[in-house]
Swiss-Prot record:
Residues 187-246, 249-312, 458-519, 819-878 form the SH3 domain. The keyword Zinc-finger applies. Residues 19-40, 120-145, 574-659, 688-758 are annotated as: Disordered. The gene is Sh3rf3. Pathway: Protein modification; protein ubiquitination. Gene3D superfamilies: SH3 Domains, Zinc/RING finger domain, C3HC4 (zinc finger). It comes from Mus musculus. Disulfide bonds: none annotated. GO terms for molecular function: ubiquitin protein ligase activity; zinc ion binding. Pfam families: SH3_1 (PF00018), SH3_9 (PF14604), zf-RING_UBOX (PF13445). CDD domains: RING-HC_SH3RF3, SH3_SH3RF3_3, SH3_SH3RF_C. A zinc finger (RING-type) spans 52-93. This is E3 ubiquitin-protein ligase SH3RF3.
Amino acid sequence: MLLGASWLCASKAAATAARGEGEDRQGEQQRGAQARTEEDMDESSLLDLLECSVCLERLDTTAKVLPCQHTFCRRCLESIVCSRHELRCPECRILVGCGVDELPANILLVRLLDGIRQRPRTGASPGSSPPARPGPGTFSALAGGAGGATGSPPCSPVFLSAAAGSSTSSLCDVATNRSVPVAKTLSQLPYAKALYSYEGKEPGDLKFNKGDIIILRRKVDENWYHGELQGMHGFLPASYIQCVRPLPQALPQGKALYDFEMKDRDQDKDCLTFTKDEVLTVIRRVDDNWAEGMLGDKIGIFPLLYVELNDSAKQLIEMDKLCPAATTAYNYDALLSSDPSTVASVAPGPTLSSSGAVSAFQRRVDSKKNAKKRHSFTALSVTHKSSQAASHRHSMEISAPVLISSSDPRAAARIGELAHLSCTVPTQDSSSAGPVPTALPRAAAVAGEQGMSPKVQLPLNVYLALYAYKPQKNDELELRKGEMYRVLEKCQDGWFKGASLKTGVSGVFPGNYVTPVSRVPGGGAGLPWNNVLGGSPLAKGMATIMHPGGGSLSSPATAARSALPLTTLQDHMQHPATSLPTGSCLRHSAQPTASQAGDTTIPTATHASAQALDRPTATVSPLRTQTSPSRLPSTGLRPRSVASPQHGQQSPAQMCPRPAIPFTSAASAITPPNVSAANLSGEVGGTPISGLSTPSLINTGFKPDDKKNEKKEKKSGLLKLLAGASTKKKSRSPPSVSPTHDPQSAMDTSLQGAMGPEVSPLTVHGRAGSCPIESEMQGAIGLEPLHRKAGSLDLNFSLSPSRQATLSMASIRPEPKPLPRERYRVVVSYPPQSEAEIELKEGDIVFVHKKHEDGWFKGTLQRNGRTGLFPGSFVESF
């Protein structure tokens, strides 16, 4: 019993002692964990202050300090070099002259992190388990998602992981992990594989062997790249390599070459004004001369001639030019053919004559156009959304009001009127409208005689004014932008008769200044497509520029409305000389109609001595002058084939087919928007200038010789006038050629020979009066475009060889096209003034690709491979 009692007492004492030791150990562990937590919190708070200002990630020992003493992580500096091809401080924009590897580390940062790492940890028991590895959320953002090696020994914590409690990491792990994203970054760069060896033909070319991996830095054009291989930069032909990871697509942007400001800011609020050297984003193409863009928070349209586009913007412009316009224009040109089989083969549907097929085709065109339409105007946001909700959308697209926002609205009504063509146009008997002039052999007829116009009574539709309009006659109604108007009647010439819902005042106003708010769904009643037209729609369709290949170039607003039903065209082809009656709202004009496809004439119309156009019509005819008080109707004139004055009248056998070209806005090709057309018209003295016309066969009281002499006098006077204007504005005068590649330019020589020396082939592209001009400038003749900066844009759109041909003919090396370049030496340093310019240092070698007529060169620096603009007076050839 005594032994048992002693054993029991001993066991109780041992248990009590063990319990005390356990409590002491537990308290020590709790105190150690609390101390570690406080220490980790202090270190985490300290490290939160040590972060990169670009990516907001924590800095480590691989961070680099710039000469301006700003410190950034290595990954951000490498990404800046890859994207910009130069290194500038993100804080103060100071240019760094050395590479990222040559930059020193921040000694203060390294010592601070090293002190944290070497500081002894308190409260860690020898038997405690090693700290866990950092979770996926710790270094994944810094190291690009790559974890460190699992076997590395634990060091002091760098920062606290939210997912793993007391997980820590070490600076040695950071150094290990930082090598992974660098290699990963290099693998994510755009690169290509060499298909052949290239030794280089000129200084500055990059030499490489077959199978080499070349980092692509920049695409010079379709045939040449600028790349890097083993630290060497140079040019390489595109046909010698195969792009594995292509270059990223840049934003479609353009640099302003000139100042663009509108004179009347109230009526031209939709125009995007800018100054020289500003960079704007290109949204879409409006027509052949205008595009929609964005500058800051403002969206508007601007002339393409005023902006130098980059490659992405050029591709966007070409897609907008070819996809919507070429498709519909090609179908329309095919419908002009008299061969029914040709019409059936090109027709978009089997039942083109029905309104359902036309609306389906129109929806396909609209969807293709709206696929790239990322922005729209504020004034059209409500009405445009409501119009897209309709099942049959026959109203005018957004490109129609954009087309006329900053041009003469009377001229734009002729082009935009194609939206009001009827699906079922009844034919009229030409014998009931008086005499019809006899057409020349293979020439177009003209229907413009007087009569009564059938008017369609519309329902009480409410329209929204898109633009302000000031009345020019007593019966016209003033339009204010944003106000509602009720349309009572719609005239054939594009004018509406209605009343203001706000004031109740009634009158006539241009229909292209308003857009319908209350639309009738379906293809049925009360819309502009249900008008009964007395003129031939073929006269309005001839506003496109046809080419021998069968396609045509026209504005999107015109081309989108060119898909006409088969019955309409057949009826009007059977009656090419239908009469045009006039009503109370209709103003009289001359409307040329095409007798058949492939006519040999250029439809023109002339002013008689006491005859002037009073209202804009949907035809291609000269504008009325502002100073003409006459409201007399103009008689129908027969267009004749334009021939050289030395040869007189030609026989039908001598009249070879030529494409028809409109002359509706000849002044738009010679008058830049910043040259005041009002001043020009004031110097003319209000004398209306005749349209582009040749001696007519109609007896108007003038002999051919007298008319020829009068035309010469007007030509010489206008040449002197514009010569003085161009001298004053030479520093701001834009190039008058389209910046996009136009296949029509190859026809200028043949057209010049056929038209004679008196008329120069001024061709325009669908936007009537591309810039705000007066109608006195509309009939400018004999003026060559001012090719001042025609070579300022890179128009080399040659196609690179296909990959199939390259692989099938691997044994044959393609011959690369030579890149035009000349070696120049910089004699005076030049600091860049904008993003498009490059910095020149004395002694640098520059490869000049293009020389602009204003003295600026476009070239590539051999030192860093950057391409841009620079003044030619700072370099010399050697």
